[in-house]
Amino acid sequence: HGVEFYPAGRGIGHQIMVEEGFAWPGTLVVASDSHSNTYGAVASVGTPIVRTDAASIWATGKTWWQIPPVAKVTFTGILPPGVTGKDVIVALCGLFDKDDVLNHAIEFTGSEETMRSLPMDSRLTIANMTTEWGALSGLFPMDGVLKGWLKGKATTAAMGLADGPFKTLAARNFTHPAIEQLFVNPLTADKGAKYAKELFLDLS
């Protein structure tokens, strides 16, 4: 059936989903673990499901998701050297600690300059820990930072330098034509999109 099987010892599940290109920008990805929000770092709406829902997906190939309220989190300023994504999400959890985003989908945004100061490792950490903040998902934009990371993966894969036991998989999923096609019509919020709430954090 074309199922890729990763036995015990092959790596952390969420890391594999990102590193091997299963969590792909512009897609919805579900998994039976509360930190499936991690995939939002690569502009994939990742959200957890319970194991019975996972079983029904195996049986039917279908699932459902009740669309949650959306909270827009706007970053301003520039992340200083030595400050990490963990610092950012811990600050968000501490500053907005009254169930502000409980069961919300979060959309992270900011100016090009601001978002450029948030590298992929920081985005992965922030998206991962939106679970601790009470959110159902945490989505970062399809921007230059993501594109640069994807192109780096594609170049590494094309050169046969991908790490791990699944080199061929990385090469198949990460290609320059596929990445260029993604950014022809990138995932963006509709003009005039309305949000349940808007929060702001100065990274400086």
Language model region names:
Residues 1-204:
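Fe-S-dependent hydro-lyases/dehydratases of central metabolism
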